[in-house]
UniProtKB/Swiss-Prot annotation:
It is a single-pass type II membrane protein. This is Kinectin. It is found in: Endoplasmic reticulum membrane. Keywords: Coiled coil, Endoplasmic reticulum, Glycoprotein, Membrane, Phosphoprotein, Signal-anchor, Transmembrane, Transmembrane helix. It comes from the Eukaryota. It comes from Homo sapiens (Human). The keyword Coiled coil applies. Glycans are attached at N172, N435, N772, N904, N1055, N1088, N1263, N1329.
Length: 1357
C-alpha cells in the first residue's frame, strides 16, 4: 500500500485542515496585541504638552472651515478606523488575553485577500463615524492647523496614535518610526493610516500635497520592511466590545489638545529638541526591533499589558465616557465579523468537501488497485499453472532423455563388445601372420617365383575389382541421384495432390453449402423450378462432356493397368532369374564345400559372393521401394478412379433427387387436384345457395301474388263493410287496427334497418314481414266480414298454421346457415391442417435428406481418411525404408573396409598357401577361373538389373506424365464443377434463404475454416519436418562423401604399399640373379623369362656345367665355391635378416594402418552413433508428426465426407438435370397454375373471412329478429285473443246493421274509412316497393360477385 491509500492519510487531512483553521482564528484574535502595546509606549514617550497661540488656533479654525466642505469625509473616515484600533487594543488589555508568539506569520497571498475584504468593509464604518462627528458629540476633534514647511514627511504625526496607541511623531522627522511601526499592521489598514497626518496636510491648503504625502508614506512602509507581514485580526470577544470605544474616544480627546499645543510650540523648540528626538527615535527603533525578535510567555505578556494599562489609565476613562455613542459602530463591526466568520466557515466547509472528494477519489483508487491486484493474482495463478505445466513437460522430457541415454549406453556397450571381438580377431590374425613369416623363412627360395606371378595376378585382379567397385559406386550414386529426383518429383506430385485436395475440399464445402441451400429452398420455394430447368439443360451438356472425359480417363487407366501388368511380369521374370542365380550359387557352394584343397579360396569367394548377394539385395530393396512407389502411384490412380466413381454416384444421387422432385411435383398435382375438388365443393355450395336464393325469390313472388289476392279480398270486404251501418264499432276496430298497424310499422322499420345489413337472407325476412302485415290486414278485414262468413275461425287457424310454417322455415334457414358456417369452418380447419401437414412433410423430407447427406458425408469422410492414413503410412514406411537403406549402406561401407582388410590378410595367407600347394595349383586355378566366370556372369546380371531399373525409371516418368494428364483432366473437371457450382449459386440466389439452414451453414463454414487453419498449421509443421529431413539427408550425403574420401585414401595407401612391395621383390630378384651369375659366370640364361623360369633354366645349365668339370679341379673349385657359398650364405642370411627387418617394418606399417583404420572406424562409429541419435530424434519427431497427422486425418474426415457429399450431390444434380429437361414445360405450367391458385386461394380465403364476418353479423341480426319475432308472436297471441272479442263485437254489429240498414250516415262513414285504408295501403306499398328494390340491388351485387368468381374459376380451369 502507498501512503495516500492508508487510513492514516484519511484521518490526517481533516485534522490538518482543522488545525490550520484554529490557528487562523487564534492568530486573528491575538495578532495586534503586541503592536498596540508598543504603540502605547511610544505614544507615552512622545506626548509632550504644547500650547497653541490664539492666532494660530484661529488660522487653524479658518482653514478647518475651508476644508470641511471638500475633505471632511477623508479626515473623519481615516480617524474612525484608528479609534477602532485603539478601542480594540484597550479591550484586549482589559481582558488580559495572552499574547501570541510573533513567529507565526501568514503568507502574502492571505494578506492580500484580507486587504481586499477590509477595504470593502471600511467605507461603511467611515461614513457612520463621520455622521457621529457631525452631530458634535466630541468638540475637541477639530484642531487648528499649523503652518508646515514643505518636507517629504509631515511635521507632526501625533494623531497616528489612533491607529497605533502610544505612537506620537514630532514635526521634523518622526515618519521613519511611524513607518516601521506600520509595517507590523495589516496591509488592509492603509486607508486608515495616519488621519492626523492628513489634517496637517489640509492645514497647508494643498490637496495634492496630501495625496503625495500619503503615497510617500505607503511607499516607505513597503520599502523599509518588506519582509514583515502582519496578520489582520478581528476580535470576537463579546466582553471587549464596550470598553474599546470608550478608550478610543478618550484617547482622541486627550491627544488632540496635546497635539495642538505641540504644534504651537514646535516652531520655537525645533532646533533644541532635534538631537533629543533623534536619540529617542533611535532608542524606540531599537526597542521595537527587540520586541519583534523576542518570544514572550504568558506571564511576560500579562506584565507588558499591565504596564500599558497603567500608562493609558486616563485614556481609558475618557474612552469609557464615549463608548455609549459608538455602540452602533460596534454592532456593525460585529456584523462584519460574523460575516467574516461565515466566510471562514464556508471556506472550512469547502475544505471539508474537498477532503470528502479526496477520500472518494482515494476509495476509487483503492477499488482500482484492488481490481488490479485481483487481475494480477489471476495472472499469477495462470502463470503458476503454466509453470507447473512446463515443469511437467520438462520432467517428461528429462525422463525421455534419461531413457535415450540408457539406450545410448546399451549401444555403446554393444559397440565396445564388437570392438573387443575385433581386437581378438586382429590378435589371431597377427599370430597367423607371425606363423606365416616363420614358414616364409624356411621356404623363401621356392615361393618367390610363385609369389611374383600370384602377386602380379592379384594386383591385376585388385585393380579390376577396384575399378568395378568404383563403377558400382558411380552407379549407386547415379541411382541415388535418380532416387532423389524421383523423391523430389514425388514431393512435387504430393504437393500438387494436396493442392488439388484443398481445392476440391474448398469446392466441396462451397458445393455442400450450395446444395443445402438448394435443398432448403427447393423444399421451401418450388415456384422457381423454371429457372432451374433452363440451367439444367446447360448442365446436361456439361455432364455429357464429363462422361466423355470420364471414358477417356477410363481408357487411359486401362492402358496404364496394362503397362503395370507388363511391368509386373518383368519384375516376376527378374525374380525368377534371381532365384535361378541363387540356385546356381548354392550349387557352387556345394562344389566349393566338396573341394577340400581350395577351402580358403572358397571362403574368400563366399565372401565375395555374399557381397554380391548384398548388392543384389540392395538392388532388390531399391526395386521394392520402387514397387512401393508404384503401388502408391497405383493407389493414387485408384483414388482418382474412386473420385470418378464417386462423381458417378453423385450423379446417380442427383438423379434420385430429380426423382424425388418429380414425386414432389406429383404430390403438388395431387394437392392441385384436392384444391380442384374443394373448388368444386365450393361451387356446389354456391350453386346450392343460388338455388336457395332462387327458391326464396319464387317464394317471394308467390307471397307477392298472395298479397295481391289478399288486397283484392280486402277491397271486397271494404265494399261489404261500407254497406253496413254501425259506425262506432267500425271506428273502434279501425283504431285498434291503426294501433296495431303503427306497432307493425315500427317493427317493420326496425326490420328494414336490419335487412339493409343482411346480404342474402333479407329476402325471406322481408317476405315474412309482408306476410305478417298482410295477415294483420286480413284479420282486420275478416273482423268486418264475420257477419257474412262462417268459416272465419278456420281461416285464422290456417293463417296461424302458415305463420308456424314460416317460423319453421326461418328456423330451418337459420339451421342451414349455421350448418354452412360449420362446414366452412371445418373446411378452413381442414385447409389449415393440410397446410400444416404439408409443411411438416416438407420439414421431415428436409430432415431426412439432411440426415442421409450427413450419413453419406460421415461414411465418405471415414473412407477418405482411411485412404489418407494408408497413403501417409506408406509414405512413412518408404521414408523408414530409405533411412534403413542408408543405415545399411553405412554398415556396408564399414563392412567393406573390414572386408578389404580381411582380403589383404587373406591374400597374405593365400600367398603362403600357394607356396605350400604348388602341386594343386592347376586344379585350384581352374576352379578359381570358373568362379571368376560366375562372378562375371553375376556382374552382367547386375548390369541387366540396372538396365531394368532404367527402364523402370522411364516407365515411372511415363506414369508421372499420365498422372499429370489425369491431374489436368481433374482440373478440367474442377472447372466444370465450378461452373455447376456457379449455376447452383445462381439458382440458390433466386431462392430466399432459410434462417435455420443459414445458421447451420455458417456453423459448418466456421468449423471448416477452423479445420483449414489446423490443416495449414499441420502442413507448416510437416514442411518444417521435411526441411529437417532434407538437412539430415544432406548430412548423410556429407558423411557418405567423407567415407568415400577415406576409402579412396585407404585404396591409395594400399596401392602404394603394393607397389613398394613389388619394387622390393624385383630388387631381391635382381640381386639373386646377379649373385647366381657371379657364382656361375659361364651359365647364361635369357632375362626375358620370368623369375621362376629363369631359376629353373639356370639350375639346369649350372648342373650341366658342374658335370663337365674334372675331379681335383672340381674339388678345389667346389671347396672354393663352398667357401664362396658359405660367404654367400652368410650374405644371404644377412640379406634375409634385412628382409625380415623390412617385413617387420612393413608389418609395423600395416599395423599402423590398421590402427589408423580402427581409429577412423571408431570416429565413424561415433559419427554413426550421432547419426543414430539424430535418426532416433527424427523418429521421435516423426512419431509426433504422425500423431499430428492422425489428428489431421481425424479432422480431415469431415472435410473428405463433405467432399464426397459434394460429389454425390453433383451426380444427383446431373441426374436431376437429365430428368428435369423433360419436365420443363410442365413445371412452368404448374408454376403458373400454382401462382394463380395461390392468388385465388388467397382471394377465396379473404372472401371466406369476409363471409364469416358477414355471417356473424347475420347471426347477430337473426338473433335480434328472433327476439323481435318472439315479441310479435306474443302480440299475435294477444291479437288472437282480441279476435274472439272482435268476432263477438262483429256479431253485435251485424245485428245492429240489420236493424239500421237504411241510414245514410253509414254510407258517409263508409266513404271516409276506405280513404284512410287506401292511404295506409299506399304507405305499405311504398315501403314494400323500397324493400323490394333494396333486395333486388343486393341480388344484383350477389350475382355480379358470383359471375366474377365463375369467370375466375374458369380462368383457373
Amino acid at each position: 500500500m502507498e501512503f495516500y491509500e492508508s487510513a492514516y492519510f484519511i484521518v490526517l487531512i481533516p485534522s490538518i485542515v482543522i488545525t490550520v483553521i484554529f490557528l487562523f482564528f487564534w492568530l486573528f484574535m491575538k495578532e495586534t496585541l503586541y503592536d498596540e502595546v508598543l504603540a502605547k509606549q511610544k505614544r507615552e514617550q512622545k506626548l509632550i504638552p504644547t500650547k497653541t497661540d490664539k492666532k494660530k488656533a484661529e488660522k487653524k479654525k479658518n482653514k478647518k472651515k475651508e476644508i470641511q466642505n471638500g475633505n471632511l469625509h477623508e479626515s473623519d473616515s481615516e480617524s474612525v478606523p484608528r479609534d477602532f484600533k485603539l478601542s480594540d487594543a484597550l479591550a484586549v488589555e482589559d481582558d488580559q488575553v495572552a499574547p501570541v508568539p510573533l513567529n507565526v506569520v501568514e503568507t502574502s497571498s492571505s494578506v492580500r485577500e484580507r486587504k481586499k475584504k477590509e477595504k470593502k468593509q471600511k467605507p461603511v464604518l467611515e461614513e457612520q463615524v463621520i455622521k457621529e462627528s457631525d452631530a458634535s458629540k466630541i468638540p475637541g476633534k477639530k484642531v487648528e492647523p499649523v503652518p508646515v514647511t514643505k518636507q517629504p514627511t509631515p511635521p507632526s504625526e501625533a494623531a497616528a496614535s489612533k491607529k497605533k496607541p502610544g505612537q506620537k511623531k514630532s514635526k521634523n522627522g518622526s515618519d521613519d518610526q511611524d513607518k516601521k511601526v506600520e509595517t507590523l499592521m495589516v496591509p488592509s489598514k492603509r486607508q486608515e493610516a495616519l488621519p492626523l497626518h492628513q489634517e496637517t496636510k489640509q492645514e497647508s491648503g494643498s490637496g495634492k500635497k496630501k495625496a503625495s504625502s500619503k503615497k510617500q508614506k505607503t511607499e516607505n512602509v513597503f520599502v523599509d520592511e518588506p519582509l514583515i507581514h502582519a496578520t489582520t485580526y478581528i476580535p470576537l470577544m463579546d466582553n471587549a466590545d464596550s470598553s474599546p470605544v470608550v478608550d478610543k474616544r478618550e484617547v482622541i480627546d486627550l491627544l488632540k489638545p496635546d497635539q495642538v499645543e505641540g504644534i504651537q510650540k514646535s516652531g520655537t523648540k525645533k532646533l533644541k529638541t532635534e538631537t533629543d528626538k533623534e536619540n529617542a527615535e533611535v532608542k524606540f527603533k531599537d526597542f521595537l526591533l527587540s520586541l519583534k525578535t523576542m518570544m514572550f510567555s504568558e506571564d511576560e505578556a500579562l506584565c507588558v499589558v499591565d504596564l500599558l494599562k497603567e500608562k493609558s489609565g486616563v485614556i481609558q476613562d475618557a474612552l469609557k465616557k464615549s463608548s455609549k455613542g459608538e455602540l452602533t459602530t460596534l454592532i456593525h463591526q460585529l456584523q462584519e465579523k460574523d460575516k467574516l466568520l461565515a466566510a471562514v466557515k464556508e471556506d472550512a466547509a469547502a475544505t471539508k468537501d474537498r477532503c470528502k472528494q479526496l477520500t472518494q477519489e482515494m476509495m476509487t483508487e483503492k477499488e482500482r488497485s484492488n481490481v488490479v491486484i485481483t487481475r494480477m493474482k489471476d495472472r499469477i495463478g495462470t502463470l503458476e499453472k503454466e509453470h507447473n505445466v512446463f515443469q511437467n513437460k520438462i520432467h517428461v522430457s528429462y525422463q525421455e532423455t534419461q531413457q535415450m541415454q540408457m539406450k545410448f549406453q546399451q549401444v555403446r556397450e554393444q559397440m565396445e563388445a564388437e570392438i573387443a571381438h575385433l581386437k581378438q580377431e586382429n590378435g589371431i590374425l597377427r599370430d597367423a601372420v607371425s606363423n606365416t613369416t616363420n614358414q616364409l623363412e624356411s621356404k623363401q627360395s621356392a615361393e618367390l617365383n610363385k609369389l611374383r606371378q600370384d602377386y602380379a595376378r592379384l594386383v591385376n585382379e585388385l585393380t579390376e575389382k577396384t575399378g568395378k567397385l568404383q563403377q558400382e559406386e558411380v552407379q549407386k550414386k547415379n541411382a541415388e541421384q535418380a532416387a532423389t529426383q524421383l523423391k523430389v518429383q514425388l514431393q512435387e506430385a504430393e504437393r500438387r495432390w494436396e493442392e488439388v485436395q484443398s481445392y476440391i475440399r474448398k469446392r466441396t464445402a462451397e458445393h455442400e453449402a450450395a446444395q443445402q441451400d438448394l435443398q432448403s429452398k427447393f423444399v421451401a420455394k418450388e415456384n422457381e423450378v423454371q429457372s432451374l430447368h433452363s440451367k439444367l439443360t446447360d448442365t446436361l451438356v456439361s455432364k455429357q462432356q464429363l462422361e466423355q472425359r470420364l471414358m477417356q480417363l477410363m481408357e487411359s487407366e486401362q492402358k496404364r493397368v496394362n503397362k503395370e501388368e507388363s511391368l509386373q511380369m518383368q519384375v516376376q521374370d527378374i525374380l525368377e532369374q534371381n532365384e535361378a542365380l541363387k540356385a546356381q550359387i548354392q550349387q557352387f557352394h556345394s562344389q566349393i564345400a566338396a573341394q577340400t584343397s581350395a577351402s580358403v579360396l572358397a571362403e574368400e569367394l563366399h565372401k565375395v559372393i555374399a557381397e554380391k548377394d548384398k548388392q543384389i539385395k540392395q538392388t532388390e530393396d531399391s526395386l521394392a521401394s520402387e514397387r512401393d512407389r508404384l503401388t502408391s502411384k497405383e493407389e493414387e490412380l485408384k483414388d482418382i478412379q474412386n473420385m470418378n466413381f464417386l462423381l458417378k454416384a453423385e450423379v446417380q444421387k442427383l438423379q434420385a433427387l430429380a426423382n424425388e422432385q418429380a414425386a414432389a411435383a406429383h404430390e403438388l398435382e395431387k394437392m392441385q387436384q384436392s384444391v380442384y375438388v374443394k373448388d368444386d365443393k365450393i361451387r356446389l355450395l354456391e350453386e346450392q345457395l343460388q338455388h336457395e336464393i332462387s327458391n326464396k325469390m319464387e317464394e317471394f313472388k308467390i307471397l307477392n301474388d298472395q298479397n295481391k289476392a289478399l288486397k283484392s279480398e280486402v277491397q271486397k270486404l271494404q265494399t261489404l263493410v261500407s254497406e253496413q251501418p254501425n259506425k262506432d264499432v267500425v271506428e273502434q276496430m279501425e283504431k285498434c287496427i291503426q294501433e296495431k298497424d303503427e306497432k307493425l310499422k315500427t317493427v317493420e322499420e326496425l326490420l328494414e334497418t336490419g335487412l339493409i345489413q343482411v346480404a342474402t337472407k333479407e329476402e325471406e325476412l322481408n317476405a315474412i314481414r309482408t306476410e305478417n302485415s298482410s295477415l294483420t290486414k286480413e284479420v282486420q278485414d275478416l273482423k268486418a266480414k264475420q257477419n257474412d262468413q262462417v268459416s272465419f275461425a278456420s281461416l285464422v287457424e290456417e293463417l296461424k298454421k302458415v305463420i308456424h310454417e314460416k317460423d319453421g322455415k326461418i328456423k330451418s334457414v337459420e339451421e342451414l346457415l349455421e350448418a354452412e358456417l360449420l362446414k366452412v369452418a371445418n373446411k378452413e380447419k381442414t385447409v389449415q391442417d393440410l397446410k400444416q401437414e404439408i409443411k411438416a412433410l416438407k420439414e421431415e423430407i428436409g430432415n431426412v435428406q439432411l440426415e442421409k447427406a450427413q450419413q453419406l458425408s460421415i461414411t465418405s469422410k471415414v473412407q477418405e481418411l482411411q485412404n489418407l492414413l494408408k497413403g501417409k503410412e506408406e509414405q512413412m514406411n518408404t521414408m523408414k525404408a530409405v533411412l534403413e537403406e542408408k543405415e545399411k549402406d553405412l554398415a556396408n561401407t564399414g563392412k567393406w573396409l573390414q572386408d578389404l582388410q580381411e582380403e589383404n590378410e587373406s591374400l597374405k595367407a593365400h600367398v603362403q598357401e600357394v607356396a605350400q600347394h604348388n602341386l594343386k595349383e592347376a586344379s585350384s586355378a581352374s576352379q578359381f577361373e570358373e568362379l571368376e566366370i560366375v562372378l562375371k556372369e553375376k556382374e552382367n546380371e547386375l548390369k541387366r538389373l540396372e538396365a531394368m531399373l532404367k527402364e523402370r525409371e522411364s516407365d515411372l516418368s511415363s506414369k508421372t506424365q499420365l498422372l499429370q494428364d489425369v491431374q489436368d483432366e481433374n482440373k478440367l473437371f474442377k472447372s466444370q464443377i465450378e461452373q455447376l457450382k456457379q449455376q447452383n449459386y445462381q439458382q440458390a440466389s433466386s431462392f430466399p434463404p432459410h434462417e435455420e439452414l443459414l445458421k447451420v451453414i455458417s456453423e459448418r463454414e466456421k468449423e471448416i475454416s477452423g479445420l483449414w487453419n489446423e490443416l495449414d498449421s499441420l502442413k507448416d509443421a510437416v514442411e518444417h519436418q521435411r526441411k529437417k529431413n532434407n538437412d539430415l539427408r544432406e548430412k548423410n550425403w556429407e558423411a557418405m562423401e567423407a567415407l568415400a574420401s577415406t576409402e579412396k585414401m585407404l585404396q591409395d595407401k594400399v596401392n602404394k604399399t603394393s607397389k613398394e612391395r613389388q619394387q622390393q621383390v624385383e630388387a631381391v630378384e635382381l640381386e639373386a640373379k646377379e649373385v647366381l651369375k657371379k657364382l656361375f659366370p659361364k651359365v647364361s640364361v635369357p632375362s626375358n623369362l620370368s623369375y621362376g623360369e629363369w631359376l629353373h633354366g639356370f639350375e639346369k645349365k649350372a648342373k650341366e656345367c658342374m658335370a663337365g668339370t674334372s675331379g681335383s679341379e672340381e674339388v678345389k673349385v667346389l671347396e672354393h665355391k663352398l667357401k664362396e657359398a658359405d660367404e654367400m650364405h652368410t650374405l644371404l642370411q644377412l640379406e634375409c635378416e634385412k628382409y625380415k627387418s623390412v617385413l617387420a617394418e612393413t608389418e609395423g606399417i600395416l599395423q599402423k594402418l590398421q590402427r589408423s583404420v580402427e581409429q577412423e572406424e571408431n570416429k565413424w562409429k561415433v559419427k554413426v552413433d550421432e547419426s543414430h541419435k539424430t535418426i532416433k530424434q527424427m523418429q521421435s519427431s516423426f512419431t509426433s508428426s504422425e500423431q499430428e497427422l492422425e489428428r489431421l486425418r481425424s479432422e480431415n474426415k469431415d472435410i473428405e465426407n463433405l467432399r464426397r457429399e459434394r460429389e454425390h450431390l453433383e451426380m444427383e444434380l446431373e441426374k436431376a438435370e437429365m430428368e428435369r429437361s423433360t419436365y420443363v414445360t410442365e413445371v412452368r405450367e404448374l408454376k403458373d397454375l400454382l401462382t394463380e391458385l395461390q392468388k385465388k386461394l388467397d382471394d377465396s380465403y379473404s372472401e371466406a373471412v369476409r363471409q364469416n364476418e358477414e355471417l356473424n353479423l347475420l347471426k347477430a341480426q337473426l338473433n335480434e329478429t328472433l327476439t323481435k319475432l318472439r315479441t310479435e308472436q306474443n302480440e299475435r297471441q294477444k291479437v288472437a285473443g282480441d279476435l274472439h272479442k272482435a268476432q263477438q263485437s262483429l256479431e253485435l254489429i251485424q245485428s245492429k246493421i240489420v236493424k239500421a240498414a237504411g241510414d245514410t250516415t253509414v254510407i258517409e262513414n263508409s266513404d271516409v274509412s276506405p280513404e284512410t285504408e287506401s292511404s295506409e295501403k299506399e304507405t305499405m306499398s311504398v315501403s314494400l316497393n323500397q324493400t323490394v328494390t333494396q333486395l333486388q340491388q343486393l341480388l344484383q351485387a350477389v350475382n355480379q360477385q358470383l359471375t366474377k368468381e365463375k369467370e375466375h374459376y374458369q380462368v383457373l380451369e
